[in-house]
Amino acid sequence: MSSTYCGNSSAKMSVHEVSESSLSLEQKTGFAFVGILCIFLGLLIIRCFKILLDPYSSMPSSTWEDEVEEFDKGTFEYALA
């Protein structure tokens, strides 16, 4: 008699578990937010590795030489202090 009762209650529980196992709106929103954060983190990691592998590709070609020429001309006032 108890085995029949357990089998009967497990059938009822499986019907209720299916309806309760669906995610609520808050859980769906949370999983979507975590997924977006994981994608963003992955993109940042890829960008950082690209910069580490070739750090000078992201720099403009005329930076240091132009500033040195301006420094030699005396355009920087604080250089005298």
From Swiss-Prot:
Compartments, record wording: Membrane
Entry's Gene Ontology cellular component terms: membrane
Principal location listed in the UniProt entry: membrane
Keyword Membrane: yes
InterPro entries in UniProt: Cortexin (IPR020066)
Membrane topology qualifier: Single-pass membrane protein
Keyword terms: Membrane, Transmembrane, Transmembrane helix
Membrane-crossing segments per the record: 29-49
Record family assignment: Belongs to the cortexin family.
Name of protein: Cortexin-2
